């Protein structure tokens, strides 16, 4: 069965997006799947402005461990975050910047609480480059302008979701894994979503939603 048929129990694409937006407004997480012919993976996504230590602990425990902070290009520029490498030749052109740590309010930087502190520091609209140390235990990602209509990635999906929900345009993501360390696929992602009260949606759902409602996002 493909993504569409497996996700049918969650409603049509528009309903799935609206359920995800409501969950984010309520401070809950969502699960975002990319295309089956791309990574074909699902990421847990939380809004930065409501992110809790307990939510971060769940991400660290249930996911790959590489917790990423999705930022607009403007915020990444404000923080003077350069690309992780000069020549990005990764398969999906994931726009990693140098990793970061908050300069104040953290110990080693690796605990759930410390990572939340770093993330909230970096996402603050008034943040300055000197508020952050480099490298660190949080991995910022630059969302491409135009969002999922420009690049069908989890990074763009995350920032688009925050803007569509009327939230600060910053979110965290991490790839969901199975207990044996393998990557979770659609059936496992659906079961995880049911267990943790997280709506499941796809990048394709978001593309359809934005086109149908002619949503122009930053």
From Swiss-Prot:
Gene Ontology biological process terms, A to Z: riboflavin biosynthetic process
Q: What does this protein do?
A: Catalyzes the conversion of D-ribulose 5-phosphate to formate and 3,4-dihydroxy-2-butanone 4-phosphate.
Q: Where is this site: Essential for catalytic activity?
A: 137, 175
Enumerate the cofactors the protein uses: Mg(2+); Mn(2+)
Q: In which pathway does it act?
A: Cofactor biosynthesis; riboflavin biosynthesis; 2-hydroxy-3-oxobutyl phosphate from D-ribulose 5-phosphate: step 1/1
Q: How is the cofactor bound?
A: Binds 2 divalent metal cations per subunit. Magnesium or manganese.
Gene that encodes it: ribB
Q: Which residues form a coiled coil?
A: none
Transmembrane annotation, as ranges? none
Keyword annotations for this protein, in alphabetical order, are: Lyase, Magnesium, Manganese, Metal-binding, Riboflavin biosynthesis
> Would the keyword Metal-binding turn up in this protein's UniProt record?
yes
Reaction(s) the record says it catalyses: D-ribulose 5-phosphate = (2S)-2-hydroxy-3-oxobutyl phosphate + formate + H(+)
Which EC class does it fall in?
A: lyase
User: Which family would the database say this protein is a member of?
Assistant: Belongs to the DHBP synthase family.
Does the keyword Metal-binding feature in the UniProt annotation? yes
The protein's name: 3,4-dihydroxy-2-butanone 4-phosphate synthase
A Gene Ontology molecular function term for this protein is: 3,4-dihydroxy-2-butanone-4-phosphate synthase activity
- Amino acids binding Mg(2+) 1: 39
**Binding sites annotated in the UniProt record for D-ribulose 5-phosphate:** 38-39, 43, 151-155, 175
One cellular component term from this protein's GO annotations in UniProt: cytosol
> Which EC number applies?
4.1.99.12
At the highest ranks, the source species' classification is: Bacteria, Pseudomonadati, Pseudomonadota, Gammaproteobacteria, Vibrionales
Assembly and binders: Homodimer.
């Amino acid at each position: 069965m493909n993504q569409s048929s497996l996700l049918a129990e969650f409603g049509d694409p528009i309903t799935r997006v609206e359920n995800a937006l409501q969950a984010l407004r309520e401070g809950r997480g969502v699960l975002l799947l990319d295309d089956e012919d791309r990574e074909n993976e699902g990421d847990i996504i939380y809004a930065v402005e409501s992110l809790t230590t307990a939510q971060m602990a769940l991400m660290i425990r249930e996911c790959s461990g590489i917790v990423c902070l999705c930022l607009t290009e403007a915020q990444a520029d404000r923080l003077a975050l350069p690309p992780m490498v000069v020549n990005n030749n990764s398969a999906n052109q994931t726009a990693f910047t140098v990793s970061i740590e908050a300069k104040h309010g953290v110990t080693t930087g690796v605990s759930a609480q410390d990572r939340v502190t770093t993330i909230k520091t970096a996402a603050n609209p008034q943040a300055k480059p000197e508020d952050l140390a480099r490298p660190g235990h949080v991995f910022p990602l630059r969302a491409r302008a135009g969002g999922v209509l420009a690049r069908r990635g989890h990074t763009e999906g995350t920032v688009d979701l925050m803007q569509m929900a009327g939230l600060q345009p910053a979110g965290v993501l991490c790839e969901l894994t199975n207990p044996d360390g393998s990557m979770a696929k659609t059936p496992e992602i659906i079961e995880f979503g049911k267990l943790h009260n997280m709506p499941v949606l796809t990048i394709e759902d978001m593309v359809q939603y934005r086109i149908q409602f002619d949503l122009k996002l930053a």
